[in-house]
């Protein structure tokens, strides 16, 4: 049997993520500490306590990468190794680290810049993204078109993640 590590993109983060791993596994603590050194701030404080910053792309992306690699290192320490890796969007960077195509510090630095550039591209309050789950694609497309026609902004399906899951962009 083959084992695949699949890494998610942004959106699954929550305050408190990784705290148990950090407290109970030295290998996870090491990953968080290494990320802190690259970032120049405490990613563990953001992951464990700061829901507001976790909602900001600039901080969420390094937090998710760090958490993903910490969890992977714990699994590896417990004898679970990946035969293959895959990632969605931001998760691709975790997959690169897991497959040893990129080292962790390089990925943290790159993802920090990625998050910063994405935040600068759409300043706070000027837009949002929503994961729409369980609705028919045509209905989502129609709703976006109606919202655009009736409003002062733009609403469009931005990413068709999977059947029944569409990421929509709203720009005001």
What are these regions (language model features)?
Residues 92-93, 129:
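A broad, low-specificity signal for short, low-complexity segments enriched in glycine/proline
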Residues 10-12, 39, 99-170:
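Alpha/beta catalytic cores of group-transfer enzymes, especially the acyltransferase/condensing modules
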Residues 2-86, 168:
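Helix-rich "cap/lid" substructures immediately adjacent to catalytic or cofactor-binding pockets
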